[in-house]
């Protein structure tokens, strides 16, 4: 084969070539190639034919059985997919082929690294989620939810109706109702080291509840406006709270004394998270930033400014030292050690995102103001499922919002609180397989990107 009869001038064409190979691998289990990929394959048919010919002629090629070629781009994709052998063989042949036909000015190391990086981003398959149970009982929007962190037997919700309710996770039955706030309960957090529940409200108060007695034992005063978010430090007897007054307060949970106030945000704070090591506090705000805080020094370690609108939601990964953040049409993940951008998610046209949750199986959930539930592969940023929440009878169109969420401790159940006053529990479809439920098509050229 003459290496001079087909020269490619730019890396865009290199990317397209590698994308076609990846598509072969990604959809190898499907009987038919998706239509939108069929047209793309047509555009690269000649190049793929040359690649196939090169593989057969290569002395290092030792594939077993029938050697299927790409002399045409078939509708029956299961046949063409047989040409996709092991990842190791593709690494070898694709790299050699590129070195043979592409301009020498395109650095070999750059091309190979780019291909290996693309391969590493291939999303893991996850079973789809489906509605398992609907729970009713609140008289207002369900604004917050937290799971029993010790035994995984119950969960608690807070609402616009000023109450909190404790529910049995297995049966969905109401265990008890906690009343004490006089305005909307915006967030709740349950300690895994003490029998304590912390709640914050638009009434400017922070309350500590003894769950063994189901009564308030402490009030924390100091915020000048409504309090939106609370988080318990995983190793210290501290809680962090924040809200409309744009400051974060760290409290000694035993003495009700504010230990430190963190100042820096230029707008109301939507969410705060605590981690065991620096940055020990992560916050997001309507000022379109995410801030990482040095608690000992009492100052910002880093400001993440990639978002363009109010950052309404964040979620810590249960295993990795990373965090996901979301604003309208934009979800990103960050390494917390340095505040480095990890992934841009396929989140265009998702609308306003109110809540994020991540489980230990690398499933990221995003709940939207439009009532859409989106599920992503956390590593690659690929959206593999999107479904609309079930509307309750008598609810208004403006009450479709998914406002809060949490996975249980196993990661196998997702609990959402919604504007139609309902609580919904979702489970993965245990009968689903890759073949029966492949999920939304994955396109390597979309915006999802792992850095």
Swiss-Prot record:
Tell me the superkingdom of the source.
Answer: Eukaryota
Entry's Gene Ontology cellular component terms? catalytic step 2 spliceosome; cytoplasm; Prp19 complex; spliceosomal complex
Task: List the transmembrane segments.
Answer: none
In terms of SMART domains, this protein maps to: WD40 (SM00320)
Cross-referenced Pfam families, in alphabetical order? Answer: WD40
Where does it reside?
A: Cytoplasm; Nucleus
Q: Which cysteines form disulfides? A: none
A GO BP term here is:
mRNA splicing, via spliceosome
The alphabetical list of record keywords is: Cytoplasm, mRNA processing, mRNA splicing, Nucleus, Repeat, Spliceosome, WD repeat
Q: Where are the WD repeats?
A: 137-168, 180-210, 222-252, 264-294, 306-335, 348-377, 397-427
Q: Which proteins does it associate with, and in what oligomeric form?
A: Belongs to the CWC complex (or CEF1-associated complex), a spliceosome subcomplex composed of the U2, U5 and U6 snRNAs and at least BUD13, BUD31, BRR2, CDC40, CEF1, CLF1, CUS1, CWC2, CWC15, CWC21, CWC22, CWC23, CWC24, CWC25, CWC27, ECM2, HSH155, IST3, ISY1, LEA1, MSL1, NTC20, PRP8, PRP9, PRP11, PRP19, PRP21, PRP22, PRP45, PRP46, SLU7, SMB1, SMD1, SMD2, SMD3, SMX2, SMX3, SNT309, SNU114, SPP2, SYF1, SYF2, RSE1 and YJU2. Interacts with CEF1, CLF1, NTC20, PRP45 and SYF1.
Other notes on this protein? Present with 1770 molecules/cell in log phase SD medium.
Tell me, in a sentence or two, what this protein's role is: Involved in pre-mRNA splicing. May also be required for cell cycle progression at G2/M.
Stated name of the protein: Pre-mRNA-splicing factor PRP46
Q: Which organism's genome codes for this protein?
A: Saccharomyces cerevisiae (strain ATCC 204508 / S288c) (Baker's yeast)
């Amino acid at each position: 084969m003459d290496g001079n009869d087909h020269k490619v001038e730019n890396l865009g064409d290199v990317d397209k070539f590698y994308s076609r190979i990846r598509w072969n691998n990604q959809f190898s289990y499907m009987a038919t190639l998706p239509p939108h990929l069929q047209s793309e394959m047509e555009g690269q048919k000649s190049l793929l034919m040359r690649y196939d010919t090169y593989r057969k002629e290569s002395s290092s090629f030792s594939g077993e059985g029938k050697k299927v070629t790409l002399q045409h781009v078939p509708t029956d994709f299961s046949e063409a997919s047989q040409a996709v052998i092991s990842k190791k063989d593709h690494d070898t042949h694709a790299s050699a082929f590129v070195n043979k036909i592409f301009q020498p000015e395109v650095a070999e190391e750059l091309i190979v690294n780019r291909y290996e990086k693309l391969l590493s981003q291939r999303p893991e398959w996850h079973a789809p989620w489906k509605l398992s149970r609907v729970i009713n009982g609140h008289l207002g929007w369900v604004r917050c939810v937290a799971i029993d962190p010790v035994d995984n037997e119950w969960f608690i919700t807070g609402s616009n109706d000023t109450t909190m309710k404790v529910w049995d996770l297995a049966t969905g039955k109401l265990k008890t109702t906690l009343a004490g706030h006089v305005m909307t309960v915006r967030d709740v957090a349950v300690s895994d080291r003490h029998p304590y529940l912390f709640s914050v409200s638009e009434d400017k108060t922070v309350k500590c509840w003894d769950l063994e007695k189901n009564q308030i034992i402490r009030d924390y005063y100091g915020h000048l406006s409504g309090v939106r978010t609370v988080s318990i430090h995983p190793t210290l007897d501290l809680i962090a709270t924040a809200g409309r007054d744009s400051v974060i307060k760290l409290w000694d949970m035993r003495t009700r004394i504010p230990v430190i106030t963190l100042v820096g945000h230029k707008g109301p704070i939507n969410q705060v998270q605590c981690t065991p090591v620096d940055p020990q506090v992560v916050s997001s705000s309507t000022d379109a930033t995410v801030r990482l805080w040095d608690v000992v020094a009492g100052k910002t370690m880093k400001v993440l400014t990639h978002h363009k609108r109010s950052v309404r939601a964040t979620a810590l990964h249960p295993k990795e030292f990373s965090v996901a953040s979301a604003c309208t049409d934009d979800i990103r993940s960050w390494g917390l050690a340095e505040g480095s951008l990890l992934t841009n998610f396929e989140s265009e046209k998702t609308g306003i995102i109110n809540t994020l949750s991540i489980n230990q199986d690398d499933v990221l959930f995003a709940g939207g103001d439009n009532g859409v539930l989106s599920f992503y592969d956390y590593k690659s940023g690929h959206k593999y499922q999107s479904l609309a929440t079930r509307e309750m009878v008598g609810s208004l169109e403006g009450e479709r919002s998914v406002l809060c969420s949490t996975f249980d401790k196993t990661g196998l159940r997702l609990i959402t609180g919604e504007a139609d006053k309902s609580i919904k529990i979702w489970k993965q479809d245990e009968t689903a397989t890759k073949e029966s439920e492949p999920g939304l098509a994955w396109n390597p050229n979309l915006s999802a990107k792992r850095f």
